């Protein structure tokens, strides 16, 4: 895969950072560029963390010149985007919190920068800063203002995790014992999962609220998070390492047409998200808009309807593309547990009721299809869209202008011009186009025994809505060549889960934006094995003797019967890189293979069918697992390359033949994991979590869910312990114990 120029968190000049959708009222406001320097620093730090100075540099990006300018700029801009204005007293409180962080951070960094200092004092300053962040972080999770909160909360979490990494790497010079360092490692790993869960709780509340209001505002909020929130949550995981690459491949969506409200989260998860994604591992080659209009006896046009968009991917006219399942053949047995669609033809079809009594247009309708083909250029990707519609008085007229780049696809058929509504993002191109149903219930046909594929249908035709999906330029190489081309000049490659060559039956698209990718692959029950293959090619001049490791991001909420295996295949040559029978874990886990060379795998620059294959055999009926991404990194040699700086201790990794077993075998007094059966008692305004078996007992009106069997029952503002049997009874400040069966009863401040 080539190193494309756009990377949300790349160390490049500021002009290449995406600012906003440049239509009349930009959906992403330019002031959020304030977040870019933070991202720029993190991208650099992942390659080489500045020992003892990483936190100081990160703090200087969030609070430049020891001022609150960046955080205040982000807050004001997000308030404008979401039309959420914090109360004056809340703003004053947040400003006071910023100033407190600035003060303590300056005290700490100034002290440890001295040529001579007392380790015990340095340790005290470090703990004061860490504890203040833990204590005050709930101030940035504001019930009722989750949309404004999430961007501020994300930056404060980033600051804390950066501080913890500094402590892990430099703690021995700051008075920390080996046991103290283990405790910091434990805290870091716990808080990566905890902060991710809390962040997704804020996102889910706001996104669900906006979906119920209208889809346009929901997608606007989603775009903001895709640019300025989710890449940071991905950075939290990657802060464990040195020599990795942080890359955002999330799409941005623009909605044009009549507002659609009342959308449920299950509608988004089950069908709408998949519809917007189009063929997930394909790119758009041309777009066909099927529209209709009718005339009265005088030939006056009364109404024009966009009935559907027929995108064609990679020039293929036959139904292709994977939206819920990768096979055209029918299942070998009935399977109705998934509220997922398995296969959708490229052409979005709107079916009338059986008796045709609910047709939206009269019999004298003219139907036409207008087609836009790919521009004949050296870079055959649509970059801009000019799409707008006009509603005329008394509900008599609808009109459309649709233009991709310089090609007019649909001219308005109503009197008068329609103003330009240019859609464009710096560093993005158009990969998918969808027509979106308006106030129409989504239905599925679950007769798996009689249909060769499961078709998404609508109960009646619908009109007036188009959604354009923009993908970042760093995905162009794959979509242009359908393979990942590796170059010797790059030290790391990020391969999103959805950029596969093939995928097995009973595999579904899952929306997981916190991974900074367009979804993950969810593998469900099968006796044949679940598999995703990723095609790779080596560019001329590639050094096949260079040693690499493969980092695989996955989540398995139940024990996998035979584990996940990683193989490389070329002309029948298979090599097992590793396998991990994993105990159930509700959070994302990185599996890191042993180092290997492409010579070891039998792959050369002449290879034409080389694959990374991720699979699990014999998954039982109740089991499923998720694949997010692959990261190929150069092994650590001569003080350069990939290495794990924050291990998943106290988990012990014991080597067995061709297999890694992950076990919790330790005499330490703490556990890290944020696993099933987590229970927290509180009454405050939002819940975290996002997945099955979420149990919430609370007086608030929403539920998110993110981890299995998460239970929250609360009457207080927040709690800071995150291990089993943690008990905290306090009316003040913050607590610092993080071990099992920890019990603290205090009314004091610190």
From Swiss-Prot:
InterPro entries: Pest_crys (IPR038979), Pest_crys_dom_I (IPR005639), Pest_crys_N_sf (IPR036716)
Note: Toxic segment of the protein is located in the N-terminus.
Source organism: Bacillus thuringiensis subsp. medellin
Taxonomic path: Bacteria, Bacillati, Bacillota, Bacilli, Bacillales
Family note: Belongs to the delta endotoxin family.
Keywords carried by this UniProt record: Sporulation, Toxin, Virulence
Highest taxon in the source lineage: Bacteria
Sequence segments annotated as region (Disordered): 672-750
Keyword Secreted: no
Biological function: Promotes colloidosmotic lysis by binding to the midgut epithelial cells of mosquito larvae such as Aedes aegypti, Anopheles albimanus and Culex quinquefasciatus.
Name of the protein this chain belongs to: Pesticidal crystal protein Cry11Bb
């Amino acid at each position: 895969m080539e190193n494309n120029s756009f990377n949300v968190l790349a160390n490049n000049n500021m002009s290449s950072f995406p600012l906003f959708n440049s239509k009349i009222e930009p959906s992403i406001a330019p002031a959020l560029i304030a977040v870019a320097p933070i991202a720029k620093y993190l991208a650099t730090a992942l390659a080489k963390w500045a020992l003892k100075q990483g936190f100081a540099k990160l703090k200087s990006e969030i609070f430049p010149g020891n001022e609150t300018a960046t955080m205040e700029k982000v807050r004001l801009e997000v308030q404008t985007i979401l039309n959420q204005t914090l109360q004056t007293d809340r703003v004053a409180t947040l400003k006071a919190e910023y100033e407190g962080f600035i003060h303590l951070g300056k005290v700490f960094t100034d002290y440890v920068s001295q040529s001579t200092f007392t380790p015990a004092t340095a340790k005290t300053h470090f703990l004061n800063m860490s504890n203040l962040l833990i204590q005050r972080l709930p101030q940035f999770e504001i019930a009722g203002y989750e949309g404004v909160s999430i961007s501020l909360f994300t930056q404060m979490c980033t600051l804390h995790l950066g501080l913890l990494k500094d402590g892990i790497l430099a703690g021995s010079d700051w008075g920390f014992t080996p046991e103290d360092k283990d405790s910091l490692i434990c805290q870091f790993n716990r808080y990566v999962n905890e902060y991710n869960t809390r962040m997704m709780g804020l996102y889910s509340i706001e996104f669900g609220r906006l979906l119920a209001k209208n889809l346009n505002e929901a997608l606007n909020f989603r775009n903001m998070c895709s640019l300025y929130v989710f890449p940071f949550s991905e950075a939290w995981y990657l802060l464990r390492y040195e020599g990795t690459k942080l890359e955002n491949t999330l799409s941005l969506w623009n909605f044009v047409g009549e507002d659609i409200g009342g959308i449920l989260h299950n509608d988004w998860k089950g069908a709408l998200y998949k519809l917007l994604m189009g063929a997930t591992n394909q790119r758009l080659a041309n777009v066909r808009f099927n529209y209709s209009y009718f005339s009265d006896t005088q030939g006056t046009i009364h109404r024009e309807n966009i009935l559907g968009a027929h995108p064609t991917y990679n020039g293929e006219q036959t139904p292709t593309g994977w939206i819920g399942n990768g096979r055209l053949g029918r299942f070998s047995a009935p399977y109705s547990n998934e509220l997922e669609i398995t296969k959708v033809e490229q052409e979005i079809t709107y079916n009338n009721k059986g008796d045709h009594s609910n047709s939206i247009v009269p019999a004298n309708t003219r139907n036409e299809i207008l087609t836009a083909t790919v521009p004949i250029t050296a870079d055959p990707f649509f970059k801009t869209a000019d799409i707008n519609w006009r509603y005329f008085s008394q509900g008599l007229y609808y009109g459309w202008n649709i233009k991709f780049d310089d090609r007019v696809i649909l001219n308005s058929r109503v009197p008068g011009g329609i103003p330009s509504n240019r859609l464009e993002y710096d560093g993005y191109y158009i990969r998918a186009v969808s027509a979106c149903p308006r106030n129409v219930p989504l239905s599925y046909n679950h007769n798996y025994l009689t249909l060769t594929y499961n078709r998404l249908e609508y109960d009646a035709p619908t009109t007036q809505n188009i959604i354009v999906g923009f993908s970042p330029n760093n995905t162009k190489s794959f979509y242009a060549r359908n393979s990942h081309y590796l170059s010797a000049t790059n030290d790391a490659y990020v391969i999103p889960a959805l950029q596969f060559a093939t995928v097995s039956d009973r595999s579904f698209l899952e929306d997981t934006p916190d991974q900074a990718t367009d979804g993950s692959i969810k593998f469900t029950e099968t006796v044949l094995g679940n598999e995703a293959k990723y095609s790779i090619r080596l560019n001329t001049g590639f050094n096949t003797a260079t040693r690499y490791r493969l980092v695989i991001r996955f989540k398995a909420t139940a024990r996998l019967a035979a584990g996940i295996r990683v193989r490389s295949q070329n002309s029948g040559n298979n090599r097992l890189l590793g396998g991990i029978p994993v105990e159930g874990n509700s959070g994302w886990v990185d599996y890191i293979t042993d180092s290997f060379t492409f010579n070891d795998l039998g792959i050369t620059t002449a290879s034409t069918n080389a694959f990374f294959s991720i699979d699990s055999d014999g998954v039982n009926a109740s089991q499923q697992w998720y694949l997010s991404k692959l990261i190929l990194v150069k092994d650590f040699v001569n003080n350069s390359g990939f290495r794990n700086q924050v291990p998943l201790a106290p988990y012990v990794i014991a080597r067995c033949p061709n297999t890694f077993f992950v076990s919790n075998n330790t005499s330490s007094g703490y556990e890290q994991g944020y696993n099933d059966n987590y229970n927290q008692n509180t009454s405050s305004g939002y819940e975290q979590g996002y997945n099955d078996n979420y149990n919430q007992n609370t007086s608030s009106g929403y539920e998110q869910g993110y981890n299995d069997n998460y239970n929250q029952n609360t009457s207080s503002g927040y709690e800071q312990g995150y291990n089993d049997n943690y008990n905290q009874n306090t009316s003040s400040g913050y607590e610092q114990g993080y071990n099992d069966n920890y019990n603290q009863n205090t009314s004091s401040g610190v």
